[in-house]
Amino acid sequence: MAYRKRGAKREDLSQQHERLQEKEIENNTDVTMENKNNNNNRKQRLSDKVLSQKEEIITDVQDDIKIADEVKKSSKEESKQLLEILKTKEEHQKEVQYEILQKTIPTFEPKESILKKLEDIRPEQAKKQMKLFRIFEPRQLPIYRTNGEKELRNRWYWKLKKDTLPDGDYDVREYFLNLYDQILIEMPDYLLLKDMAVENKNSRDAGKVVDSETANICDAIFQDEETEGVIRRFIADMRQQVQSDRNIVNYPSILHPIDHAFNEYFLNHQLVEPLNNEIIFNYIPERIRNDVNYILNMDMNLPSTARYIRPNLLQDRLNLHDNFESLWDTITTSNYVLARSVVPDLKEKELVSTEAQIQKMSQDLQLEALTIQSETQFLAGINSQAANDCFKTLIAAMLSQRTMSLDFVTTNYMSLISGMWLLTVIPNDMFLRESLVACELAIINTIVYPAFGMQRMHYRNGDPQTPFQIAEQQIQNFQVANWLHFINNNRFRQVVIDGVLNQTLNDNIRNGQVINQLMEALMQLSRQQFPTMPVDYKRSIQRGILLLSNRLGQLVDLTRLVSYNYETLMACITMNMQHVQTLTTEKLQLTSVTSLCMLIGNTTVIPSPQTLFHYYNVSVNFHSNYNERINDAVAIITAANRLNLYQKKMKSIVEDFLKRLQIFDVPRVPDDQMYRLRDRLRLLPVERRRLDIFNLILMNMEQIERASDKIAQGVLIAYRDMQLERDEMYGFVNIARNLDGYQQINLEELMRTGDYGQITNMLLNNQPVALVGALPFVTDSSVISLIAKLDATVFAQIVKLRKVDTLKPILYKINSDSNDFYLVANYDWIPTSTTKVYKQVPQPFDFRASMHMLTSNLTFTVYSDLLSFVSADTVEPINAIAFDNMRIMNEL
């Protein structure tokens, strides 16, 4: 009927359009009597409508929805029915358009990507090192003669491997914080030297050294003409030493003493632990191990060299559910998407045939044909896809503790009756408060109160009691009041299982007995007289209840099936299931609940073992990564505090922490939550390994500064030009190697107090001042760039008399405000500058002091996926039993 009227609607519209055009032409030519008549007629029609007692239904004008004349003449119920169908169709079109729109908005992220991000979080397999950890590397530097020209000889010094300081104003302390962050990222969980060892090319007997970088250093030193013969002979003898009885091997390595300290620490504090069959079996969640529906078997015995890294599964260190609405919403959303992917599907073969069921329902409703009666909409929207979607939504929302909101039409009594099953089975906490109140109020005012002839409930917004709680006190019927009492007290029970907080369902729901309570209440309601309502109304409600009560057995089975799937998958969750209402909600249509209630068959559907293992692995990996990133962030915050960078770096540290969790859209997180997160992180203790590593850096800051080409240990400032000195490493440069004879002021103290008067007085008295402290500087050793910035005539003689490429002029910038300091500054060819950089000589490379023997296990194998050793199968689904040792689905 709904679609047959579309032609009439279009016809009406076209006729209207023609009439309007004719009126416009007439108005242009003659604007008198007809206009007045039309106005009078319109006024008359309006007054008739206002004074008329005949009810007329007015709808929105969207999509030009109009009601044909024949429909207006039909009964009130038929009008409402047609309107509902048209409205439903319109809303469906809107939803489709909204989905299309969402996919075209660039900022929208499809949920598949969240799932991929979660599944891509792997255990720390990436931290298996193929090289030793190094901050330093030996480098050959030329020696400069007295006249500033290079010699052919070279000398070896320890320099920084990554000497990266950004341009401009930059605090050296930030360099050390970034270095520490880098070490935390690269810090290996275990070191197996045998895996990284490479052949020593210069060895006499095909010996091996610890890694490729050691081999390259040995190669370069061996080929250096100035290397002593004894060192060459030593390199030729460098090889590994195996002690097979103790399962250890020693490898020679070339390392700076600080790098040696780092690698020794990593070797002595490895995270690997022995692995055996018992550990793997205990790794499987206990409830799945003890579930008789799953048959688990170990495929093989593990060798004694098997190792694994124990996942870090500490609970609730940040309590993100408490006062972090945006973060908690993102976590629950990602958990919901993951949970939906593992909840088993109710395929069409496992459900009752939709056509057959609708036909049976039509017979139960005594519909000879699908005429427009209020009962016809009971059948609207029933399909297997909606049933499956509802099943997955309910279980996934409970697993992720994600709040649901209910979408329903008050006039569809079947939806409301299905909603009564939903509210009976799912705890109240799972629904948005406003949505729960609206649904309960609709059930009370449409079904419960009319049955007993009670007046409509007028619910005050903000009332602490829900409509069901108010109704429980007012209804005298024992069965109905008893059912309302159960719903009002239906909450999750919080139980700690295997150290994890679980939200468990009431035992009456788990075994399905609560459905009998629901049916008793429904039967009582259907027997009532509905004294204040028409007979048709009573008949519609009774038939809706009949449809649901005819499926009593299936509803008991459905309730047991939902409970079993929820509890089995819940065993794979490793993070505490904290329950807090989420900012955004998952929409649940009550028509899809009707589909599930009406189409559920007698086929048992339980998660496959592979699905359970996958869900468990993803949960463990995310949880472990979450805790490791917390440890990193806590360590960096502590380091920033001790380096006096607390205020400067704090927000970026928290942002990095969230980015590394991979599921957060960091720019959208409100600042207040960022700072609250900082406060929580600040209260946590630093993990031992990370603290020891930071102390190693702190103790050796000066050595690291000396090895950098971009960090100075101080600066000398004079009022008049100072003559540059020859330096063996750089030629004529404005570098001072000692501070003898200079008055020294601590740079940090100066910056803290801000009292520069002392410096000014000294400079005016022509006394050079030495500001001592680490500071960055910029170097440019290109002759061309210097000539480009200065008068070329200054360099004319030098260019003429010497080879330009033998010189190494250096330009130093202490910070973005300082002057530039050049090699040549006057016409006497005596290099001068008003500023000198105080730079200590880097540590010379001494082969004997740099050769270290490192010891590790000869061999072991680290396994990351422990569950790959377990083969699993299930019993025949029809025989699957629930916690009470009875079949999940009894209705056969």
From Swiss-Prot:
Post-translational modification summary for this protein: Sumoylated with SUMO1 and SUMO2. Sumoylation of viral proteins seems to have a positive role on viral replication.
Region of interest (5-fold hub), residue spans: 1-90
GO MF annotations in UniProt: RNA binding
Hydrophobic: annotated span: 406-426, 434-454
InterPro entries linked: Rotavirus_VP2
Ranges annotated as biased composition (Basic and acidic residues): 9-26
Region of interest called Disordered, as start-end residue ranges on this chain: 1-48
Ranges of biased composition (kind: Low complexity): 28-41
GO cellular component assignments: T=2 icosahedral viral capsid; viral inner capsid; viral nucleocapsid
Location relative to the cell: Virion
Subunit composition and interactions: Homodecamer; each decamer is made up of two conformers of VP2, called VP2A and VP2B. Interacts with a VP1-VP3 complex. Interacts with the intermediate capsid protein VP6. Interacts with NSP5. Interacts (via N-terminus) with NSP2.
Domain notes: The N-terminus binds RNA. It is necessary for encapsidation of VP1 and VP3. The N-termini of 10 VP2 molecules form a cylindrical hub underneath each 5-fold axis of the inner capsid.
Family stated for the protein in its record: Belongs to the rotavirus VP2 family.
Protein name per the record: Inner capsid protein VP2
